[in-house]
Amino acid sequence: MRRVGTCLVAVAIWGGVAWGAAEPAPLDWRKDTYESDPPRLANPLRDATLSVSGQWSDRGPQYVTDGEIVANNHWACEQLPAVLTVAMREKSAFSACRIWFYFGEPRIYKFFIEASPDNRSWTRIADWTKNDRPATAEGFVVAFGKEVEAQYLRVTITDSSVRGAGGHIVELMVSSAALTPGLHGRQAPTDRIDDANATGDESLKTWRAAAWRNERVHGQFVVWSAEAVPQLRLRATALRSEKGAEIPASAVVPRFVRYVRAGKKTAGDILDPAPSVDLPAGGFRPVWLTVTVPAKTRPGLYRGCLTVKGAAGKEVAFPLELEVLGAKLPDPEDWAFFLDLWQHPWAVARYHGVAPFSPEHYRLLEPIYRELANAGQKTLTTTIAELPWNHQNFDAYHTMIPHVKNADGSWSFDYALFDEYVAFGKRCGLGPQIHCYTMAPWGDRVYYIDGSTGDQISVALRPGTPEHEAYWGPFLKAFQRHLVKKGWADDTYIAMDERGPEDTRATADCVKKFAPRLKIAMPGNHPPSHFKGIALDNYCQFIAHVDDAFLKEVPQRRAEGKVTTFYVCCGPSRPNTFTFSPADEQVWLGLYAAANGLDGFLRWAFVNWPRDPLFDSGFGPWPAGDTFLLYPGPRSSVRWEMLRDGIEESEKIRVLRGRQAASPALDESLSAFHFKSAEKSTGAALSEQVRRARQAVEDAARTLR
């Protein structure tokens, strides 16, 4: 494990970095990625029950499947034949095994291997009874000739070159993949990689993609090895065209995919710029490649290479081919897609152990917020109430504007933190909208400071009551005056989250009465018909409630300067952005907005981190990854990159439509993007929808000049 910097995307520098082992830096749990279970190839023997014909001293069969290739850690049996029987938990298919006998000194073992479906009828699948090769640290790869399906495996050692010493097995591994020595690899789709799909055709090493200028495009690769390979390092070259044009190496960034807990399993989601990662015996490691195509890149075919290299000279090279099209994406600040991912500054402060809104806190927030701005984020999340979401976060949200009730009954409001934070967010590129949560907090409880005693007072105030109006009316008047002075009044929205129509209407009426220049924003989880007649300037609807009537209103709302988006949260189960969600689901969300004419997408949240997000992405009863998309570091994630990718696809479609280049094939592919069918679909079916839409976008882009 390595201490890494705070840059989101980093390049491992090839020159000047020595290959091989180095002293590890001390682990800092706030900065270093660590995995509860490093990814390993599927090995049916891992949880198997082992029995033996006998054992010497403490040299029992537990060593045979512990994943460690250590000569002195072996099962030993002095009496020949020495028999090891493996009972797997279920039937498995495999085509080869790799077996390590004791290799501390030159010894030759003769043996045969049998398989059985039921522990009664046995078939010999490998015969090495005439073996004359001594055992080595590389072990023997034993091919079975054809795929074998069995639940039981038996290894019988018939002879040893050291008389009287018996039989000794260090490790046994079976797999449907190649178990030959060395580092293996392949190019892979940009999807979740696990032990079931890690290995594959090693002849498929070349990554090929097409990209617009000013686009961020991705690829994925997987390397694996039967033996341990310490100090895997990554190097990507510049991409060059035959005419001498270049995409610099700084724009060609490989990162290791790290695994994090996602419920009862782990999922490869963290994109880690660590300088090196150790590959355990029988392990695999995905590598994620991101190419940011400069806006002024000349169209053409660009070539380069990604190399994954470990200690002892083991390496795999992956050729890279990127076709840069003539089409160009606007800069993110000019994207029309309305992205609203809520921020949580207190979570960042707690995780890093710094005082909220201290200079160090802002230093940590800046790369996070700039990355969000680089995806076209249109809102800054602020708070005007204590605990606007009650206690449903690991870290509480606090108010940025303390309310003080003076002894004479008047109110005072301190805008210092609010002003400082809004100015900071705008410098980072967030906005222009400022969303203020909330006049309708979950639980209806509001807080203020008693100016006479300094005590914090809390009281439940339901929207629509005289008491609610008496509390919020003075604030709204003063707040609007302050915002006018700052020049922010027209960009400020009083925001509510998933409140019913009665509370929403009452709150909107209160704002209109006391601060008519301010607007209303709300993500709603009730059918749109329930909110008829309520002036919602920014209206986000839960995807399951998006209906034809709602969609028909979008063009008119847009003409009136209003924003209409959709959101997902702890539901639906598909499509979504959970840690375990198939990667194409995040792309699907961006394409769904384009297909249905919606302005954009909202999600709770961007960095609402649980206690230890680099280790466990879950929080409370919600699905893993529900509360955040970016990891500490900051480190990107597969789901964040793919969500951003979907936003880019939506922007491409906007450009194509604006230039009358949207083809019938593109329109046809987008016609399939409906939630009701998607939630009942399979991951493979959604991936095919995404593939067809991407291809149609690419084909249409080729017509642009």
Q: Predicted segment positions?
A:
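Bacterial N-terminal signal peptides
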Residues: 7-16
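Aromatic, loop-rich ligand-recognition surfaces of beta-strand-rich domains
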Residues: 22-27, 33, 38, 58-126, ...
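Beta-strand-rich interaction surfaces with strong enrichment in secreted/lumenal proteins
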Residues: 72-77, 131, 144, 207-209, ...
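Short edge beta-strand/loop segments characteristic of extracellular beta-sandwich folds
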Residues: 87, 98-100, 220-224, 292
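Surface-exposed binding patches on compact interaction domains or structured appendages
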Residues: 181-203, 216, 223-289, 297-298
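Aromatic-lined carbohydrate-binding surfaces of glycoside hydrolases
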Residues: 291-292, 302-310, 316-517, 523-533, ...
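Catalytic domains of carbohydrate-active enzymes that cleave complex glycans
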Residues: 445-449, 456, 460-526, 598, ...
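Catalytic-core region of carbohydrate-active enzymes that cleave or remodel glycosidic bonds
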Residues: 538-619
